[in-house]
Amino acid sequence: MAKKDGAIEVEGRVVEPLPNAMFRIELENGHKVLAHISGKMRQHYIRILPEDRVVVELSPYDLSRGRIVYRYK
């Protein structure tokens, strides 16, 4: 996982899939965010299903949106 400078990585659980490869993620602390799949995950056809545990990268500027960078097996 290539970490961007200033990005915040948190673990969460996929609550529901949304159109256009977006997902509603519930973080460990209870907050819900909107996240899309990172380019490398999309490139390698990694499937994200409801109830999957994932790592989400959040921008410090907008903590309500993020990018899924890893799916736990």
From Swiss-Prot:
Belongs to the IF-1 family. Component of the 30S ribosomal translation pre-initiation complex which assembles on the 30S ribosome in the order IF-2 and IF-3, IF-1 and N-formylmethionyl-tRNA(fMet); mRNA recruitment can occur at any time during PIC assembly. It holds the Pfam family eIF-1a. One of the essential components for the initiation of protein synthesis. Stabilizes the binding of IF-2 and IF-3 on the 30S subunit to which N-formylmethionyl-tRNA(fMet) subsequently binds. Helps modulate mRNA selection, yielding the 30S pre-initiation complex (PIC). Upon addition of the 50S ribosomal subunit IF-1, IF-2 and IF-3 are released leaving the mature 70S translation initiation complex. The keyword Protein biosynthesis applies. It is found in: Cytoplasm. GO terms for molecular function: ribosome binding; rRNA binding; translation initiation factor activity. PANTHER family: TRANSLATION INITIATION FACTOR IF-1, CHLOROPLASTIC. Keywords: Cytoplasm, Initiation factor, Protein biosynthesis, RNA-binding, rRNA-binding. Its main location: cytoplasm. This is Translation initiation factor IF-1. Transmembrane segments: none annotated. Residues 1-73 form the S1-like domain. PROSITE patterns: S1_IF1_TYPE. InterPro entries: NA-bd_OB-fold, RNA-binding_domain_S1_IF1, TIF_IF1. It comes from Mycobacterium tuberculosis (strain ATCC 25618 / H37Rv). One of its GO terms (cellular component) is cytosol.
